[in-house]
Amino acid sequence: ERDVNRVQLIRQMGLIEGQPILNAQEWESVRARGSSVIANWIDEQMKYKAAVIVLIGRETASRPWVRYEIQKAWDARKPLLGIRIHGLSSMGAVDTIGPDPFTQISGFEGRNPGLPIFDPTVSGVLGDIDSKATYQNLVDHLRSWSSQGRVRQA
């Protein structure tokens, strides 16, 4: 999948406490067992999370299980926030920005219900993305951003 390397890069930073690293093989094992197993796995993981951070790549908003996790967190009144990851290098390349996945929350179709999205992307002098500076910007700010999620109000 398009952003797997970027997501693993962030998880390996070790800056978010209590976040287990699920490698691609483990995810494939869960995914191979079907939709109900995936939903149950997400539900179980979410029970123990203080907040949900959505790592937003180019295709994140179109992924059904990401949408499920966002809606589940919203309904459970878990703090939610997004961090854009398109500016991180994956296989030596950066990507284009993806759409806001929070616009698909039930009752808010087409608009973000006030959830923060942080973008660590740093552009060089010529306007191209500097992936190393973007990585460092993310390292410098991830902890503070992770505590700024917003919850559903009534």
Per-region residue spans from a language model:
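Conserved beta-strand-loop-alpha-helix hinge of the TIR/SEFIR fold
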Residues: 45-74, 78-89
